[in-house]
C-alpha cells in the first residue's frame, strides 16, 4: 500500500539541503521567508554575526491594521515591499533569497517579486 508523503518532513529536508549551500553576509544578507497559515514573515539575516538586520511581517505595525488575514498573496506582496524599503533604508541592495524549503509559488513568489520591485537585487 502506498503511503502519502509527509509534506512537512519533505520541506524540512529541502530546507536543510539548501541552508548548507547558502550563507548571508553583511554585504549580502540572506532574505529568509517564513510562511504560517495566517501570517508571512521576512528577515534579512547576516549569518557571519548571527544578526537579523531587517525584519518585516504582516504583524508589523505598518501592516497589521491593513489586512484582516495576513495569510494571502496580497499580504505577502505588502511584506515584500516593506522588507525591500527597510533594506534600502539600511543601505542593502543585494540579498541571497532563502525560501526555507517552500516552493517558489503563491505567497513566497509574491513576496520575492515585491521585494525585487522595491529595489532588492537577487
From Swiss-Prot:
Q: Which InterPro entries match?
A: Ribosomal_uL18_bac-type, Ribosomal_uL18_bac/euk
Tell me a Gene Ontology molecular-function term this record carries: 5S rRNA binding
Could you confirm whether the keyword Ribonucleoprotein appears in this record? Answer: yes
Give the UniProt keywords, A-Z. Answer: Ribonucleoprotein, Ribosomal protein, RNA-binding, rRNA-binding
Q: Which Pfam families match?
A: Ribosomal_L18p
GO BP annotations listed: translation
Record's subunit section: Part of the 50S ribosomal subunit; part of the 5S rRNA/L5/L18/L25 subcomplex. Contacts the 5S and 23S rRNAs.
Q: What does this protein do?
A: This is one of the proteins that bind and probably mediate the attachment of the 5S RNA into the large ribosomal subunit, where it forms part of the central protuberance.
Q: Which family does it belong to?
A: Belongs to the universal ribosomal protein uL18 family.
The name this protein carries in UniProt is Large ribosomal subunit protein uL18
**Whose protein is this, by species?**
Desulforamulus reducens (strain ATCC BAA-1160 / DSM 100696 / MI-1) (Desulfotomaculum reducens)
Amino acid at each position: 500500500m502506498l503511503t502519502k508523503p509527509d509534506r512537512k518532513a519533505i520541506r524540512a529536508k529541502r530546507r536543510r539541503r539548501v541552508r548548507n549551500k547558502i550563507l548571508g553576509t553583511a554585504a549580502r544578507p540572506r532574505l529568509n521567508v517564513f510562511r504560517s497559515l495566517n501570517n508571512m514573515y521576512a528577515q534579512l539575516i547576516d549569518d557571519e554575526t548571527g544578526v537579523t538586520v531587517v525584519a518585516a511581517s504582516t504583524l508589523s505595525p505598518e501592516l497589521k491594521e491593513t489586512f484582516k488575514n495576513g495569510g494571502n498573496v496580497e499580504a505577502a506582496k505588502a511584506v515584500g515591499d516593506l522588507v525591500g524599503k527597510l533594506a534600502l533604508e539600511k543601505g542593502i541592495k543585494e540579498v541571497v533569497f532563502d525560501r526555507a524549503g517552500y516552493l517558489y509559488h503563491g505567497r513566497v513568489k509574491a513576496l520575492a517579486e515585491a521585494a525585487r520591485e522595491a529595489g532588492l537585487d537577487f
